[in-house]
Amino acid sequence: MMRSLGRAGLLVLLLAGGQGAWAEAIPAAVGRISYGDTPAPGAAICSGALVAPDLVLTAAHCVRGAATDPASIRFDAGWSGGQPGGQRRGAAVILPEGTPVAGMAGLAGDVALVVLEAPFPPGAVTPLPLTDPAGRSFTLIAFRRDAPDQPPRRDLCATLATAPGLLGLGCAVVSGNSGAPLLARDGTGWRIVAVMVAASRGGPVRSWAVLPPAALRLRIPSSAGGSGG
C-alpha cells in the first residue's frame, strides 16, 4: 500500500521488501510489524527496531491507523525464516505532535514509537542505540510484504541528498521496508541513523529516510540507546 506525495514524486510505503544480504548476523532488535494475528499472504506489514526494552522505532504511517487500538500491533523481534526471536503486542503509540501535512515537511515527521505491552527481558533482545549520521554510506535492514516470513533484506544505501530532517538515498525500496532502520556500524556495534519512510520516483534518489527528531529521542531512555556516539 502506497500514497503519493505530489510533485516530490514520493511514494510512502506502508511496508517492506528487497534483496541482498551479507553473512554477518542481523541484529535481533530489527523486527517485523504486523497487525492482528498471523498476517495473511499479501497483508500489510512494516519493519521496526527495538530502541529500549519496551519501545519500537518505526514510521508513523505504519502505526497511525492503529493508535486507537495499539494491541492490534504485533512486533516480532529477530524474525527469521518464520521464527521470531520474541513477540510483543503494542500498548500505546507515540506520534509526532500536530496534524500530518503533505510534502517533504510531512515526510520529515513520519516517525513514531510503539510502546510494547511488556519489555523484553535483559539479554533476550538488545536494543539498538541512535546516533547522528557520519559518512554517506549506511545499511538498511528491512522486511518485505511479498515475502513476510523470510529473513530481512540487507542493502547498502548511499546518501545522495539531504533535506531538513531527511536523507535522500540511492537504494530502492519496496512495500514492507517502511519503518526499517538505516544503520551505521562502529566498534561497538550497530546504531540507528534514520528510519526508512518512502520511495522516490525519477532521478538518482530512490528513497527517503527520517532522522529521528530530538523530541522523539527524549522519549527513549538514554541507557537504552536514545543517544549515540
Q: PLM features: residue spans?
A:
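A conserved glycine-rich beta-strand in the N-terminal activation segment of trypsin-fold
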Residues: 30-53, 179
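Bacterial N-terminal signal peptides that target proteins for export
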Residues: 1-10
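Conserved catalytic-core segment of clan PA serine endopeptidases
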Residues: 22-28, 35-40, 64, 70-120
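Chymotrypsin/trypsin-fold serine protease catalytic domain
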Residues: 108-111, 115-173, 177, 205-209, ...
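Cytochrome P450 catalytic-core helices
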Residues: 54, 58
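Catalytic nucleophile loop of clan PA
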Residues: 49-50, 172-196
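Short beta->alpha transition motifs characteristic of CBS
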Residues: 59-62, 175, 193-202
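N-terminal signal peptide c-region/cleavage motif recognized by signal peptidases
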Residues: 17-18
